[in-house]
Amino acid sequence: MYLDLDVILAELKADDWLASDVDLDAIEEPKTSVATGIELQYVMEDEWDRDRVVRAHQEIASKNIELVPLTSDALDAAADLRAQYTALNVFDGVHLGSAAVLDEPIISTDTLFPEIPEVEHLDPRDLE
């Protein structure tokens, strides 16, 4: 299952609003794109110290979340989705495109994702 950034943040931030609702053990073969490591650095740059920010991808991997490569196929899928759904930002497109190419559902609380039928969406709060 492909994890969006909100699920990653729930695992890495003790005070995250979603932390008590995410159970990585309930997620089969969790994975995310290396782009999530970049997005995590961008989002946490003002909150974490620099040493932690620059190694954000290592924190993801330390949670036994597989970091999958960002491929040109995933970028093509992202481009197709962003062309069709103008509300998708760059990272939304990359995450959905990666999940689509991997043929994995995306685990996210993003309220836009259920409107994208090309990729199965699961809310982490609904997993047991």
Predicted ranges, named:
Residues E29-K31, K63-N64, P105:
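Short loop->beta-strand "edge-of-pocket" segments that line small-molecule binding or catalytic clefts
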Residues Y2-D4, T32-V34, L88-N89, D110, ...:
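Histidine- and aromatic-rich ligand-binding microenvironments
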Residues N64-Q84:
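Acidic catalytic patch
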Residues I8-L9, G37, F113-P114:
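A generic structural signal for short hydrophobic patches within well-formed alpha-helices
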Residues E66-L67, L96, A100-E128:
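Acidic, PIN/NYN-like endoribonuclease modules and their adjacent C-terminal/linker elements
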Residues L5, S72, F91-G93:
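Conserved glycosyltransferase catalytic-site signature
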Residues M1-T32, E45-Q58:
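Short, well-structured N-terminal submotif of metal-dependent ribonuclease cores
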